[in-house]
Amino acid sequence: MALSFSLLMAVLVLSYKSICSLGCDLPQTHSLGNRRALILLAQMGRISHFSCLKDRHDFGFPEEEFDGHQFQKAQAISVLHEMIQQTFNLFSTEDSSAAWEQSLLEKFSTELYQQLNDLEACVIQEVGVEETPLMNEDSILAVRKYFQRITLYLTEKKYSPCAWEVVRAEIMRSLSFSTNLQKRLRRKD
């Protein structure tokens, strides 16, 4: 067991170093993954959103954190990473597993996981290039609070199918904002 864990860690470190040494072209690699995630999320819809209009909720998406004009690239990547991490966490719960068709949920989670790996490699590279703090704490906190509100909503609604549908639509909206941030980053390069 200890040997296999050590081997796994060695492979992970080597692959991480090779990813980082290739350079970070986040806007191209990440935006394709983001589009695939959006398509999968759209396919996951099980019920008509019209039947859930009474359950709509304003989660207070932190749009200003995805403006992109005030960020250096490393900070913007850190915000994107936090959003994808929180989305991954939300859809990795047991309650989420019961709400969605399993194969689509697995594909969606795999796509998010790949994006996290890409973003982590880019964060490491960009911090080294720009020598800026790893992340903008206020922005990261705003994203975390946003996801806390989503989780609280699901809990209050007892993870009902309509609650999950509202959350699915909200996550699609937030992923769209991240796509727009990526476009702005591409223009800055």
Swiss-Prot record:
The keyword Secreted applies. It comes from the Eukaryota. One of its GO terms (molecular function) is type I interferon receptor binding. One of its GO terms (biological process) is adaptive immune response. Its main location: secreted. One of its GO terms (cellular component) is extracellular space. Residues 1-23 form the signal peptide. Keywords: Antiviral defense, Cytokine, Disulfide bond, Secreted, Signal. InterPro entries: 4_helix_cytokine-like_core, Interferon_alpha/beta/delta. CDD domains: IFab. It is found in: Secreted. Disulfide bonds join 24-122, 52-162. The keyword Magnesium does not apply. SUPFAM superfamilies: 4-helical cytokines (SSF47266). Belongs to the alpha/beta interferon family. Produced by macrophages, IFN-alpha have antiviral activities. Interferon stimulates the production of two enzymes: a protein kinase and an oligoadenylate synthetase. This is Interferon alpha-4. It comes from Homo sapiens.
